[in-house]
Design a protein with these regions (language model features):
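C-terminal transmembrane helical hairpin of 12-TM major facilitator-type secondary transporters
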Residues: 297-342
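Helix-to-loop junctions at the C-terminal end of transmembrane segments
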Residues: 72-85, 282-296
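Hydrophobic core of transmembrane alpha-helices in multi-pass small-molecule transporters
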Residues: 26, 112-128, 322-337
């Protein structure tokens, strides 16, 4: 009688551990969303005599510096976490994130260039959080509930972005009470920085006290073979394309508001809130229905691409603001449907390569955002609202690849299915 040796079961995450992991994603997203709207007025005080166009240029460059930090750091931190342990890299990333925020309170150390360095540094340390959290969740989650947990992580990021303006409101209220002659915008910005740092420090402490220190059992050679890089190249290209579309689409909304008097600032803000809420609803749908476990990922990606195409078409041809809202909803729903599929399929990587896989996806997303902002700004300057139609090109490319190269997506999906669930 032949005996069989059962593979050791991977320890599942406890609810408190999962909470702190999702909260870490929430905090870094909220910190970015809270500080970004305050940068123009804050920089005006840091650069005496600057013109509005100069301030706007620096705001764009600072956002680019942050994104560049994520782009460079994500694959590096992912690779290091696979070797040294994901828990310690995650905590180290939060320590660096909190430190880079607090140092913003001392811009006199080097003026404007110090702010540039600190924003790039913040992006570099956030890059240690973005890929490592999903890698930890994938490594310690049975496949049967993995899709739901990744939907939860996506929701945490979106909620963090929505929470950013709320953090600003709290800061404004506190600044009004404690101003004592200090300019309100300067004090409000400092309070946002301190609150963001406190939230980051709280998550850092919670993760240090609750996360597992071991990385789980070693994998068999079959699982390692199932994580061949070629299959995940398709996911990286998909991440670049979808993030390019999403970034260009969001920038197009902002520029549309600036060039058309009938579209108020409040309406533009409402469209951004609509975008986040629709994507949050899509994540809730994936969470409660476990759709990714029941339907071919290839079909989900195709459906999301078609929805986004419809939304961009409406935005390119709209005649009234009401049609703009419809276009925003459709585009948000489509991109919001595709993005969780990418992370879910990437979770099928070998446990030993989860960090570098998720890091590659984070870098691909940052590259797509950078390309989308650049292309979106140039296109809108050239053809205005028809830029939305040109942004549909990457989505057409996705649909063509889904038809002409179905083996890419079947191979990637099979790798996710082969990842250990017990």
């Amino acid at each position: 009688m032949r005996s069989t040796i059962k593979k050791p079961r991977e320890a599942d995450l406890r609810p408190l551990q999962l909470f702190f992991l999702a909260a870490a994603v929430f905090v870094v997203s909220a910190g970015y969303g809270a500080l970004l709207p305050l940068l123009p007025a804050w920089l005006s005080r840091q650069i005496p005599g600057s013109t509005p166009s100069e301030v706007a240029r620096h705001v764009g460059f600072l956002s680019g510096a942050y994104t560049a930090g994520v782009l460079i750091g994500a694959p590096i931190w992912g690779m290091i976490s696979d070797r040294l342990g994901r828990t310690r890299i995650l905590i180290f990333g939060l320590v660096g994130y909190v430190t880079s925020l607090l140092l913003l309170l001392l811009p006199s150390m080097g003026g404007l260039w110090t702010i540039y360095v600190l924003r790039a540094t913040a992006g570099l340390f956030v890059a240690a959080v973005v890929p490592v959290v999903p890698a930890l969740v994938a490594a310690h989650t049975p496949k049967a509930i993995r899709a739901r947990r990744f939907a939860w992580l996506g929701a945490a990021s979106l909620l963090g972005f929505l929470f950013g303006p709320g953090l600003n409101a709290v800061a404004d209220a506190l600044a009004a009470v404690f101003s004592n002659g200090v300019t309100l915008i300067a004090l409000s910005t400092r309070i946002v920085i301190v609150l963001s740092a406190l939230l980051g420090a709280s998550m850092m402490l919670g993760l240090a006290l609750t996360l597992p220190t071991h990385e789980g059992a070693a994998e068999s050679d079959d699982n390692l073979a199932a994580s061949a890089p070629a299959g995940f190249a398709a996911l990286w290209w998909l991440s670049i394309a979808v993030n390019l579309v999403l970034s260009g689409f969001e920038l197009g909304i902002v520029l549309q508001g600036r060039q058309h008097a009938e579209l108020s600032t409040q309406q533009v803000a409402l469209m951004f809130a609509e975008c986040s809420l629709v994507m949050l609803a899509i994540n809730a749908l994936l969470f409660f229905t476990a759709l990714l476990d029941k339907v071919s990922p290839r079909l989900v990606v195709a459906a999301g691409s078609l929805l986004a195409l419809a939304g961009l078409s409406v935005l390119a041809l709209h005649q009234t603001n009401e049609w703009m809202y419809i276009g925003v909803s459709l585009t948000s729903a489509g991109t919001g449907l595709v993005l969780p599929v990418i992370s879910f399929l990437a979770a099928g990587a070998s446990h030993r390569a989860l960090g570098v896989t998720m890091g590659g996806l984070a870098a691909a997303g940052a590259l797509g955002q950078t390309l989308g902002s650049t292309a979106g700004g140039w296109l809108f300057g050239a053809v205005e609202r028809l830029s939305f139609a040109w942004l549909a090109a990457p989505l057409f490319a996705i649909l063509i690849l889904l038809v002409l190269r179905p083996s890419w997506w079947r191979a990637t999906a099979s790798r996710a299915a082969l990842s250990p669930s017990h």
